[in-house]
Amino acid sequence: LDLVLEQARLALRPGGVLFYDTVNRTLLARLVYLVVFQGLPLTRIMPPGRYAASRLRGPGELGEALARHGLRNEDVCDFKPRNPASLLKAVLARRRGAITDEQIPPIVDFVRVPDGSPLVTYLGYARKV
């Protein structure tokens, strides 16, 4: 993480913006990304190892890491499926080969929840100080 953030800092000019989309370190996030998306043969849609528990970060941890590299975290919002059952439906269809990755978002209908507490994934942006 530190190497990536340092490279982002070097690439940005003062006031430049870094947008991010990442996975939280909650129990639910681990279950979804490490078990459902990577571990269970029935629902595996990502190669094992794409996500590792050691690389998951909560919003507070990420904010601290951004600050260490001269990036001020400006906003974080929850990003989730409107209906979790639609995510399961899309994952199973993707696993069967019935749909492509590009067809997942309209099926799942992801929504941003600006004031929500991110349980699984979250979006945000930081600005170079």
Outline where the language-model segments fall:
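Residues in well-ordered alpha-helical elements
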Residues: 2, 60-63
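A short glycine-rich, Lys/Arg-flanked "PGG" loop and its adjoining helix->strand segment in the class I
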Residues: 2-17
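Short, glycine/charged-enriched secondary-structure capping and boundary segments
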Residues: 3-6, 33-36, 91
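Phosphate/oxyanion-binding loops and surfaces in catalytic or ligand/nucleic-acid-binding neighborhoods
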Residues: 11, 25, 68-72
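Conserved class I S-adenosyl-L-methionine
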Residues: 17-42
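Acceptor-substrate binding/catalytic loop of class I
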Residues: 22, 42-61
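Short glycine/proline- and charge-enriched loop/turn segments
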Residues: 37-47, 93-94
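A C-terminal cap/extension of S-adenosyl-L-methionine-dependent methyltransferases
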Residues: 64, 68, 73-129
